[in-house]
Amino acid sequence: MKNSFLVILTLLGIQQINAQFTRRDSLQGGLRIERTSYDVKRYDLNITINPEQKSIKGFNDITFEVMVPTQKIQLDLFDNMKVDSIVWNTKKLKYNRDNDAVFIDFPEKLASKSNHKLKFYYSGNPRIAKNAPWDGGFVFKKDSNGKDFIGVAVQGTGASLWYPVKDSQTDEPDSGASIKVAVPNGLMNVSNGRFLGSQDLKNGYTRWDWEVKNPINNYTITVNIADYVHIQDKMPDLDLDYYVLRENEAKAREHFAEVKPMMECFQSKFGRYPFWEDGYKLVETPYLGMEHQSAVAYGNKYKKGYMGFDLSGTGVGMFFDYITIHETGHEWFGNSITSTDIADMWIHESFTTYSETVFIECMKGYDDAMKYINGQARNVKHDKPIIGQYGVNNEGSGDMYYKGSLLLNTLRHVIADDEKWWKMLYDYSETFKKKIITSDTVIDYFNKASGTDLTPIFRQYLYTNQVPIFIYKIEGDYLYYHWDNVMGDFNMPIDIGFEDKKIRLNPTLKEQKIKLKKLNKKSFQIYDNQFFVKIQEGN
């Protein structure tokens, strides 16, 4: 198995050999000693945002523990932003900038297990997004009353776009964060976690203070600035808060009614909402949406589907608001369970896209769920593997959404035991709650939980862009069948039916045959709605 895996990695490497990665990519995506030598414990961000100048000024207090003795660490801040000073124990530290990396020198070696805090002062005009959230950066807009309406989305681009941070998914602040943001009077800032209070600074600005108790991905730390109205709701064990533009209050009260049944569904299938200490918020934003932890960005214009369209093309997708359901699903898959490297972002996106189908099954039943998830197949591009290249800030194919979701549906039907499947999914979410994991961790878990070696299936769908082809032909009472377009060790069953009978086959690359009395093409069917494969009738 190890040799087969090396072959896969080699093939993946050959496919990506022409990809040009820069030093900037390696500095952001790589793990060198200047990063691994310390562990971030907490961020305390205190900034002022000037909407007119589109500028930020302030500091981030970064608390960390030294893991191995070091005299130099790496933090990150986009090179268009200014480092004003970095202070440790009242001393200004020397630093060097290399692209977006900031290498900080201490006057003495820091001992292992010692704890420290440095204050990183900075300022500047952060990058403006051309098309958020796909292109990272700030969005400065106005509401219908001419008031500022501001947001930020940086997934993939990097949180260091707007604040100094260890810009790696491998390290979340274990003790959470505080986010204090001063904005012009008459505006409100909504960030992650619980609202602690506001303070008029007597200079035309009011500071809004927020506190996060849980570990948090650096790219989900956020600011949302507008003339918001606060709508409060509650479940027995969870506060629900909605911050919406004043003009949309009535629409929001009606539209967000789907949040409670969504939460009930997700908690029954994935376990308790992971960040109940920090509450759950939907915050209206000037872009489509993003999974900001405990402050989910919402910009779907209070429409069903995806901006009023059904991405599945089946009609089922118009039953729910895509952004509310999908981005909330990320609270379990992406925010709670996080991938070590963005090359493994399928751990976020595949499971979250699958959560849409789970919600439909909770609300409308299995048949509509299958209709919806199979409708997603039309969006699969088969352009490149789902898993990207490690260590260079490189995501794999966008097929991680739909193909990844269809992979999970396939695994459900390979296991062919719904009670077992739902327990596996629930236990997966609970086992790796608030943990940072790799693809190997996921595969190993599902192998052990299912009692089946699913590795060849995962490899086929994650590491190649080839979809298995089930080739068959019927001659008299005989069915001839085999797999094509698969790796040599591919091993996956598929179900067929005829005359009200359902039979499980175990095809290989070599043609097999089976005698089935009363077999005829009219009653013959292949359950390709349960397995993401292509079907081809042979000659």
Regions found by a protein language model. Name each.
Residues 23-24, 119-227, 523-533:
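Extended, low-hydrophobicity, Ser/Thr/Pro/Gly-biased non-transmembrane segments
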Residues 73, 78-141, 204, 513-519:
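A surface-exposed beta-strand-loop module
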Residues 59-80, 164-169, 176-184, 440, ...:
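Surface-exposed beta-strand/loop patches in extracellular or lumenal glycoproteins
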Residues 19-57, 65, 84, 141-147, ...:
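N-terminal, polar/Ser/Thr-rich
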Residues 18, 210, 242-486:
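Hydrophobic alpha-helical and helix-loop surface patches within well-folded domains
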